[in-house]
């Protein structure tokens, strides 16, 4: 059985891209050529989406007709809703773009302030030919800068960014609910089949039976109700994966960061562990001097600001006479081995000492993701 499944997976999808096997490539080219230019969803469809949709549609076509006559009215209300929602959010996630263009660039520059930790001002995208807004990233697959870039999703053939992140979260939630509900309902129906085949009073279903007998009994029930049983097994195996993705993105919202930003914070964590990061305050370093690139609409309207300055050195604390780099967190030490240490700087020993101005607290982070008004006042 495992051998035939392996052959099927190979012909259906390559292990690296989940979508370059001969069958899926043929289906993808056929569908794309037929629907090309008719709608953004079909013009950007790829093998990964064909593979995903094929599993989803085939599973529902196997499960629902077989289960429908056997479930109550309550379940008949839930099944259509849970079956259709993933398609709605998948569609919205694919067709909604978060691209930064010359037309909306000014608005994007005013959306988020630069924290001068993982995002510094003054960096220009050489491909798009404009300054990079805070929290943005250029995607080489989409060939565009993406607002509040999270990641490029191969299953969507689209970047997950500010405009479609809430659709992506809703897709994960609806998939998790559908898979969990499907596995529970499926095994409930298979249990009914098992009761008809082997009553609970049978010695084969005694509490003292060994694992081999238990597996054989359930194998008989699943084989007798193959449409429901096979889909129930598939949903039971895939539900933890969807839930794990949902939990991971819930954690990212709680932490006030994106997938892209979590990688940047990981780099800072390594530098902190190596003793390369030092901190001070803007008031100590600059005094009452103001800087033109700090007085921006985003700086004035974003609810959280920080007085902290971070620098990365070669392990030596900043010395008197150093120079700060305007576009990075590096410094130029004074070319004098005898220069005294600048006492305004202290070594950062933990990531907890570093401010994340994009973290507004879980509920406000969630409201910001869903484009709802943030309740916190500017401070």
From Swiss-Prot:
GO terms for biological process: protein targeting to membrane. Keywords: Acyltransferase, Endoplasmic reticulum, Lipoprotein, Membrane, Palmitate, Transferase, Transmembrane, Transmembrane helix. One of its GO terms (molecular function) is protein-cysteine S-palmitoyltransferase activity. It comes from the Eukaryota. Residues 26-48, 98-166, 249-379 are cytoplasmic. The chain crosses the membrane at residues 5-25, 49-69, 77-97, 167-187, 228-248. It catalyses: L-cysteinyl-[protein] + hexadecanoyl-CoA = S-hexadecanoyl-L-cysteinyl-[protein] + CoA. Palmitoyltransferase that targets several endosomal SNAREs. Palmitoylates the SNAREs at cysteine residues close to the cytoplasmic end of their transmembrane domain. May have a role in the cellular quality control of transmembrane domain-containing proteins. The DHHC domain is required for palmitoyltransferase activity. This is Palmitoyltransferase swf1. It comes from Aspergillus fumigatus (strain ATCC MYA-4609 / CBS 101355 / FGSC A1100 / Af293) (Neosartorya fumigata). The lineage of its organism: Eukaryota, Fungi, Dikarya, Ascomycota, Pezizomycotina.
